C-alpha cells in the first residue's frame, strides 16, 4: 500500500471510531451492560487495528523521508562537482583568447568598418540620428495623447448618461471625476497606435 492509501485508511478509521464511540455512549445508556460490553470490545479491536495501521504508516513515512534526504545529499554533491569544474574551466587559454580577438564585429553606418573604434565614430551623424529618433518619439506621443483624448470624448459621448448618473452619487467629488477621466483615457493604452486610430476614426 502506498503512503497516501494508508493515511486515507487511518483517517476513515478515526472517523468511524469517533462515530462508534458516540453511538456506544448513546446505546449504553439505554441498553444492557452485556451489549455495551460487546460494543466496547469491538471499539477496542478497532483501536488496536488503528494503532497498527498508524505504526505501519509512520514506518513507511520514515523510509520515504530517509530516501528523500539521501537524494538531496546526492544532488548537492553533484552541484558542488559542477561548480568546481566550471571554476577550473573559466580560465581561457591563450589560443582561445587569440581566436576571440580575431572575430570581426558587425559594421554600421556610424563605425564605417569592423569593430567599434571610438576615433572613427561620426558624432555629428550620431547626433542627427538621435535627434531624428527623439522627434519621432515626441510626435508619436503627441499623436497617442491626441488619440487618447479623442477616445475619451468618444467614451463620454457613448456613455454620457451613465456618467451623469455617477455625478449624482452622494460620494462623487471633483477628484472622482478626474480619476474617472484618467482611467478611461488610459484605457486607450490597451490598443496599439494604429488600432486606436481606427477606433477613433470609425466613431
UniProtKB/Swiss-Prot annotation:
GO BP: any one term: ribosomal large subunit assembly
Pfam family, one: Rsa3
Bias kind Acidic residues: ranges: 59-78
Subcellular location: Nucleus, Nucleolus
Similarity annotation: Belongs to the RSA3 family.
Keyword Ribonucleoprotein belongs to the record: yes
Cellular component annotations (GO), alphabetically ordered: nucleolus; preribosome, large subunit precursor
Listed Basic and acidic residues bias regions: 46-58, 79-89
Domain of life of the native organism: Eukaryota
Name under which the protein is recorded: Ribosome assembly protein 3
Keywords, alphabetical: Nucleus, Ribonucleoprotein, Ribosome biogenesis
Ranges of Basic residues composition bias in the record: 12-23
UniProt feature, compositional bias: Low complexity: 27-43
Disulphide bonds in the chain: none
Physiological role: Required for efficient biogenesis of the 60S ribosomal subunit.
Gene for this chain: RSA3
Disordered as annotated region, ranges: 1-90
Subunit and partners: Associates with nucleolar pre-ribosomal particles.
InterPro entries with a match to the protein in the record: Ribosome_Assembly_3 (IPR051898), Rsa3_C (IPR028217)
